[in-house]
Swiss-Prot record:
It is found in: Cytoplasm. Forms a beta-barrel structure that accommodates hydrophobic ligands in its interior. It comes from Tyrophagus putrescentiae. This is Fatty acid-binding protein. One of its GO terms (molecular function) is fatty acid binding.
């Protein structure tokens, strides 16, 4: 069984700018986001999950229980209702509702974390190495 708890450092991004553009993030913020190299920390405590993302651009944190809806500030600055479910032992699927629904799939492995985010058919894949 793959351990979800841990710290992960961004190594590579594919199509991240196009994803942010489709989401409605402005040019300046997109360029800052592309140059940032975030660290993601995942903490699982019983049935409670915390995902902290830290970078020179911005820090964010979401806390949730699987299947329970919560409010979150999306990358475009909008507040949206979000829920997260678990598929198998190593995959978290996050759905952000709103004018532009977003699906974020976090797949964990011994080596790291792959984050696949999709909005309006535009998909970005980001690869993080386990620290």
């Amino acid at each position: 069984m793959v351990q979800l708890n841990g710290s992960y450092k961004l190594e590579k991004s594919d199509n991240f700018d196009a994803f942010l553009k489709e989401l409605g993030v402005n040019f300046v913020t997109r360029n800052l986001a592309k140059s940032a190299s975030p660290t993601v920390e995942v903490i699982v405590d019983g049935d409670s999950y915390t995902i902290k993302t830290s970078s020179t651009l911005k820090n964010s944190e979401i806390k949730f229980k699987l299947g329970e809806e919560f409010e979150e500030d999306r990358a475009d600055g909008k507040k949206v209702q979000t829920s997260v479910t678990k598929e198998g032992d190593n995959k978290l699927v996050q759905v952000q509702k709103g004018d532009k629904p977003v699906t974020i799939v976090r797949e964990f492995s011994e080596e790291g974390l792959t984050v696949t985010a999709t909005v309006n058919g535009v998909t970005s894949v980001r690869f993080y190495k386990r620290q």
